[in-house]
């Protein structure tokens, strides 16, 4: 069984293409759309996430704008929990907390509704790719600001050379694929 899973993960990894100089020169963008565009690979991603998190006491899933939303809905449905959108500034209609940070693309602001998390709720954050870790770290800090207990940050892929995992310390993180 381990060999079959390992083989499937290698095929999944091959489905993620690298786009040079997107969205700006010098960035090697990991495009997940070929992987999520095929049912067998999208199902594999969700199956791996579900297996990892189904026995953990997660109350809600926080999804990072925008590709974190791709996994959050299906995963939340499978786990029977709600979703919290963590969005760019100006996208959430109610009272928000906001934090400024530097991304690989420039200055950014992430927001979360102030009432999205009850004190002590166990939160899983999901996103597509862990690159520098700055966006994910900001999302984790927003969860904490709301009073949530961050269980883990889960990613489809991690760009190990950018050392995002180091920037996330001490927050626990998991990635299905490493590049």
From Swiss-Prot:
InterPro entries: Ade_phspho_trans, PRibTrfase_dom, PRTase-like, UPRTase/APRTase. One of its GO terms (biological process) is adenine salvage. It catalyses: AMP + diphosphate = 5-phospho-alpha-D-ribose 1-diphosphate + adenine. The keyword Cytoplasm applies. The keyword Glycosyltransferase applies. Pathway: Purine metabolism; AMP biosynthesis via salvage pathway; AMP from adenine: step 1/1. GO terms for molecular function: adenine binding; adenine phosphoribosyltransferase activity; AMP binding. Pfam families: Pribosyltran (PF00156). It comes from the Bacteria. Its EC number is 2.4.2.7. It is found in: Cytoplasm. Keywords: Cytoplasm, Glycosyltransferase, Purine salvage, Transferase. It is an enzyme of class 2 (transferase). Its main location: cytoplasm. Homodimer. Catalyzes a salvage reaction resulting in the formation of AMP, that is energically less costly than de novo synthesis. NCBIfam families: apt, PRK02304.1-3, PRK02304.1-5. HAMAP family: Aden_phosphoribosyltr. This is Adenine phosphoribosyltransferase. It comes from Methylacidiphilum infernorum (isolate V4).
């Amino acid at each position: 069984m381990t060999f079959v899973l390992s083989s499937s993960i290698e095929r999944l990894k091959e489905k993620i293409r690298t786009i040079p100089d997107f969205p700006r020169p010098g960035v090697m963008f990991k495009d997940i759309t070929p992987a999520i565009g095929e049912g067998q690979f999208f199902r594999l991603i969700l199956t791996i996430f579900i297996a990892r998190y189904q026995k953990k006491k997660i109350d809600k899933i926080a999804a990072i704008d925008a590709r974190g939303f791709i996994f959050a809905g299906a995963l939340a449905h499978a786990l029977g929990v709600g979703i919290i959108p963590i969005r760019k500034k100006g996208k959430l209609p109610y009272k928000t907390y906001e934090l400024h940070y530097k991304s690989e693309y420039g200055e950014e602001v992430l927001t979360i509704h102030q009432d999205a998390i009850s004190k002590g709720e166990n939160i899983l954050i999901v996103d597509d790719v862990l690159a520098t870790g700055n966006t994910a770290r900001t999302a984790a800090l927003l969860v904490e600001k709301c009073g949530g207990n961050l269980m883990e940050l889960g990613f489809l892929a991690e760009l190990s050379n950018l050392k995002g995992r180091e920037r996330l310390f001490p927050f626990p993180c998991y990635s299905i694929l490493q590049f």
